[in-house]
Amino acid sequence: MLKLYYARPSIYARPVWLALLEKQLPFELVPVDLGGQQFEPAFLALNPFGHVPILEDGDFRVIESLAILDYLEAKYPTISLLPTDATALATVRMVQLVALNELLPAVVKLLMQDQRSDQLSAETEYAQLRATHTLTFLESRLGEAPFFAGEQLTLAEIVAGTLVDKLPDLGVPLTSCPRLMNWSERLLARPAWQQIELSPAEWLTFKRRMRVMPKVWQRRRRQRMKALAQQFSGSL
């Protein structure tokens, strides 16, 4: 059986979890505590970079969200989450990459902002503008269709759909993109989306954790650099 190492709030793990549900594949969830478990030797033996998700399929192990999504689509093509039409496929890939390369960095920056402050930093303002610009692009690509590939739910929804719905709570409303807002609401009504939905308490805890993550990352980076230096010096 497929095994997914994940954390419920993980921005990277949630699309894989969602794809498994939408494809109606049997799988086992293995929760990982991102408070430090990802840096323990047992986990680093699974992924030397110390992050989720990880997918195990028998003896084969895959890391990185996009690689896992492509693996699932190639290995388990029914139910399909990719169109075969060239234009639709290009649209899906554009949405996936724009969501990860443009929208996700903005979301992460907004999650890290100090929401107790009355004044937005220049970085936060840029993140909001970047998110708004990306939403406008997605609105134009969606057009009047129910999904980015027309009538078929695809990896475009799987990736972008796990980010868009959280933006209003981060200070970026969807009201200027009514088609995208309706699209997001339809996705949230799907059983798979409801299954992965974070409770208000989980979302609040995740936001609080993200605000302290820069300090955690700095500490973990120093620890990792020390461990890597010892590893390479011992191999010389």
Where are each of the predicted segments found?
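Short, solvent-exposed turn/loop segments enriched in Gly/Ser/Thr/Pro and often Arg
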Residues: 33, 155, 200
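GST-like fold's C-terminal all-alpha helical module
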Residues: 63, 99-191, 233-236
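Phosphate-coordinating loops and pocket residues in cytosolic domains that bind phosphorylated ligands
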Residues: 45, 189, 198
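Terminal-tail/helix-coil boundary detector
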Residues: 193-228
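GST-like domain detector, emphasizing the conserved glutathione-binding G-site
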Residues: 1-129, 139, 214, 223-236
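Short, solvent-exposed alpha-helical surface patches in well-structured domains
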Residues: 91-94, 182, 195
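Generic structural signal for helix capping and beta-alpha/helix-loop junctions
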Residues: 37-39, 184, 204-205
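Short beta-strand edge/turn micro-motifs at domain boundaries
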Residues: 20, 192-193
